[in-house]
Amino acid sequence: FLKHPATGQVVIVTAPDRREAAEGALGELHKDPRVVIVDGGARRQDSVLAGLEAASNSGLPLVAVHDAARPFVPQQVIASLVAAIQDGAAAALPVLPVVDTLKQIDSERVTSTTDRNALGRAQTPQMFRLPDLLTRHLGHPADREITDDVRLYEEDGSLIAAVPGDDRLMKLTTSSDFAMLSSLIAGTGEFDMPHEPPPIDIR
């Protein structure tokens, strides 16, 4: 994100007991004035809200909410998201086509085939106008879980843009995932890759 000219600030939300580990993982980037670390909450939506409130102090117009388990963000994806919001979308997210045949299953019994042409695989980062997303989070009932920020826009029919996703935005959850992605993008020069996979602690 810091390599993209549209980025004015990066807010990293972490569990309070992981703050020191987050600072250590950042290395020299921790000294970058654009990087801010804040404590998250018990739920995903609490952590997103903490990040949005911290970002709101920057005065920046747009915000991208991203999943740290997808560490490799192509510059073109960021550019496409920014362009979609500037063109009038209320929200934008990268989407990949569904390439596998999908089956409806009841227990262990296949009941039907689902039309995959109307489906897509949602990725992050997801981009919004910062003041608008903050307002929606603040106004959302506290007892209703938010697992995906775009859903706050689906409920009122807002224009949500789907931009082309990227396989390099795969979600890393195991060491084998890291090895696969390292092999995929080795030699491109687009990402700064560590020689060894970092400890993976998805919370």
Regions found by a protein language model. Name each.
Residues D148-V150, D167-L169, S175-R203:
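SAM-dependent methyltransferases
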Residues G51, H66-D67, P97, R129, ...:
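Residue-level signal for inorganic ion chemistry
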Residues V73-V163, I200-R203:
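Conserved core of the sugar-phosphate nucleotidyltransferase
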Residues A22-L26, L81, L102, L181:
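Hydrophobic packing residues within well-ordered alpha-helices of enzyme cores
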Residues A68-F72:
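Acidic metal-phosphate-binding loop of nucleotide-sugar-dependent transferases
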